[in-house]
Amino acid sequence: LRVEFENRTGATWPLNIGQVYTTLDRLERDGLVAKEGDDGEGHVVYSITAAGKAEVQSWFAAPVERTNPPRNELAIKLALAVTLPGVDVQSIIQAQRVASIRSLQDYTKARRDTAASQRSGDTAWLLVLDSLIFQTEAEVRWLDLCEARMVQQAQSAGSGAARKTSNGVTEDATPLNADSRR
């Protein structure tokens, strides 16, 4: 099951095998899967029941709710950084931008290589890669917005120091942290 999941999702998300067994036990208890025996190599074989198929169809048909935003470590890091004196928020933003652009290049290359290979089953991996690319592009745009907000805030505080950004625009270069907000 783990291998099949990884094949279908491009092994993007590691699957905790212990969680798989716990989930299979719960699915069996709820009548959504049934044990069929073993495969001769010590692996239990499960099959999906009619109720399980109906549950999967319901899951596919239901939109993914965005009521509880997922934990975003970067957003938390920046939110904390701007509230603490002495933290160079600009450096955090720049380091993340470099890492995000590197990831974006890797994802784009993987998408190009996968599209060129034209192997069966690549469509699922291409969908995952497209999602990762769009998320990373959005992160870079968000980092640009964070930087612009921090610069605007520093300028509002009346600082006169200047620096050049990656796109050549001269902006306020006061260290971007909670001290610059006061």
Residue ranges: model-predicted function:
Residues Q90, R97, L104, R111, ...:
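Heptad-repeat amphipathic alpha-helical coiled-coil interaction surface used
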Residues V82, R111-Q118, M150, A154:
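Secondary-structure edge/capping motif, primarily at the C-terminal ends of alpha-helices
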Residues S58-D106:
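Amphipathic alpha-helical dimerization/coiled-coil segments
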Residues R149-T165:
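Long amphipathic alpha-helical coiled-coil segments
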Residues L1-P69:
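Basic helix-turn-helix/winged-helix DNA-binding cores
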Residues K109-L129:
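Acidic interhelical loop/turn segments
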